[in-house]
Amino acid sequence: MTNTRKSHPLIKIVNHSFIDLPTPSNISTWWNFGSLLGVCLGLQILTGLFLAMHYIADTTTAFSSVTHICRDVNYGWLIRYMHANGASMFFIFLYFHIGRGIYYGSYTFMDTWNIGILLLFAVMATAFMGYVLPWGQMSFWGATVITNLLSAIPYIGPTLVEWIWGGFSVDKATLTRFFALHFILPFIITAMVMIHLLFLHETGSNNPSGMNSDSDKIPFHPYYTIKDILGVLFMMITLTSLVMFTPDLLGDPDNYTPANPLNTPPHIKPEWYFLFAYAILRSIPNKLGGVLALAFSILILTLFPILHSSKQRSMSFRPLSQCLMWMLVANLLILTWIGGQPVEHPFITIGQLASMTYFFTILILMPSTALMENKLLKW
């Protein structure tokens, strides 16, 4: 008698993806972030759905509806803060996941990597639009500043901005379309995640050694299902602690003031997870140059497979490249800090130096160090 798990047309797909999937026996905790991102996405869709039941996408009532959710809806405060801090967790895991991919050379799976970059853009767009919805001061001014950047595009820029706004400023039309897009994008992201996994399962997972692991594979269940559940447990402990004790730790106090087009906040800044890109944007005095640098700071990820010049895939056995990798991490932390600081001396100079180092490390230092390590291997 055939096993239903292996013969049923639908269950068979789940079986090949999560149960009988041959997985390298030596993948570390750095491989947990994929499943954690999946859990985060599910959590965001669920909490977002309940928030959408009470939220009103209108400039006059949006702020009040969020207040109503927190005060009057049963456990509304919990749903709202789980959603807001869940986004922060999402980005923490995203950055760890990308960092893992860079460190262990997972970007050599070109299809999986490129879909991943598109996913990153989609998640960033979703998070940005979600930040606009509470219609606080930082929501309004953040939306105004970031959408205005598109006006730097030659010839079509100003028209494009007005087209996105649905008028001559960020107003009711903007809020309505941002809510519609914020609602639909997570489902598009879910479809993209499936494509991401489809491409991954074509090649199989990478592993810390960066070598072919076909000779040493184990089934995904029970070994990695248990490991993933442990990761989810740690994530839920962290997230619930954040929500229960310091729900506003990662937010901006300005967003507790209703949006006022006549009053500009002293320091306009996005959520913490965009600060590194915001710092790169601000470090260039020219508007178009800043926008290009901002776009390229993320698009540079597409160059990793092209710039890979080492004979080894992973950085596990390459100490010099490891130093550069951690230098890049430190550099991104500095950029994140700078993005949250006012535009004044010495922050301007630090931001410019950190932005320059970011591009220099990825484009020149990392490939040349890899070539040097190839030479050292021959000695």
Curated annotation (Swiss-Prot):
Give the cofactor binding note.
Binds 2 heme b groups non-covalently.
Return the similarity comment.
Answer: Belongs to the cytochrome b family.
Which topology term describes how it sits in the membrane? Answer: Multi-pass membrane protein
Q: Which residues bind heme b b566?
A: 97, 196
Q: What is its main location?
A: mitochondrion
Name under which the protein is recorded = Cytochrome b
Annotated Gene Ontology cellular components are: mitochondrial inner membrane; respiratory chain complex III
Source organism per UniProt:
Ctenomys steinbachi
Q: What is the lineage of its organism?
A: Eukaryota, Metazoa, Chordata, Craniata, Vertebrata
| CDD domains xref list | cytochrome_b_C, Cytochrome_b_N
